[in-house]
């Protein structure tokens, strides 16, 4: 019983019949997947061979049509993406204004307070500079 798990771990110590069964199973699975793969490849080559003259004949129509359709699709996707972003932002703002505390509200409040304190600090510095400038020009 102790030898059985060891046999499963080391393929060199497995019986020859197990190795043959594994090889046969692998060959069967590989072959059964290789046949449809080859058929699909052959079908693709045949379809491309038949369609190439049509592509060449209709390319003055197809190329602009593909470009136009691509631009239309990209426009709709971009429009939808921006619409989703706008709805998300408006929803976040609504939750923030109503006090529901959306994700990131703490960071926004912290940044707002930091900005307000810097603005006050700059205002005080400007007032000090203005007073120094006024007193300096009066003394001259």
Curated annotation (Swiss-Prot):
InterPro entries, alphabetized: Oleosin
Xref: Pfam families: Oleosin
Topology class, membrane: Multi-pass membrane protein
Compartment(s) where it occurs, according to its Swiss-Prot or TrEMBL record: Lipid droplet; Membrane
Transmembrane helix recorded as keyword: yes
UniProt KW keywords: Allergen, Lipid droplet, Membrane, Transmembrane, Transmembrane helix
Transmembrane segments: 31-51, 75-95
UniProt GO BP: lipid storage; post-embryonic development; reproductive structure development; sexual reproduction
Expressed in which tissues: Expressed in seeds.
Coiled-coil annotated residue ranges, if any: none
Keyword Transmembrane helix applies: yes
Chain's role: May have a structural role to stabilize the lipid body during desiccation of the seed by preventing coalescence of the oil. Probably interacts with both lipid and phospholipid moieties of lipid bodies. May also provide recognition signals for specific lipase anchorage in lipolysis during seedling growth.
Family: Belongs to the oleosin family.
Name this polypeptide is given: Oleosin Cor a 13
Organism of provenance: Corylus avellana (European hazel)
């Amino acid at each position: 019983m102790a030898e059985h798990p060891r046999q499963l771990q080391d393929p060199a110590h497995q019986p020859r019949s197990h190795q043959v069964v594994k090889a046969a199973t692998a060959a069967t699975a590989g072959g059964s997947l290789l046949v449809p793969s080859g058929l699909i490849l052959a079908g693709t080559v045949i379809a491309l061979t038949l369609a190439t003259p049509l592509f060449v004949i209709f390319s003055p129509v197809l190329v602009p049509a593909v470009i136009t359709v691509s631009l239309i699709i990209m426009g709709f996707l971009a429009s939808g993406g921006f619409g989703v972003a706008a709805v998300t932002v408006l929803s976040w703002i609504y939750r923030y204004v109503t006090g529901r505390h959306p994700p990131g509200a703490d960071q926004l409040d912290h940044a707002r307070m930091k900005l307000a304190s810097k603005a006050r600090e700059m205002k005080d510095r400007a007032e000090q500079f203005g007073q120094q400038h006024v007193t300096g020009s009066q003394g001259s």
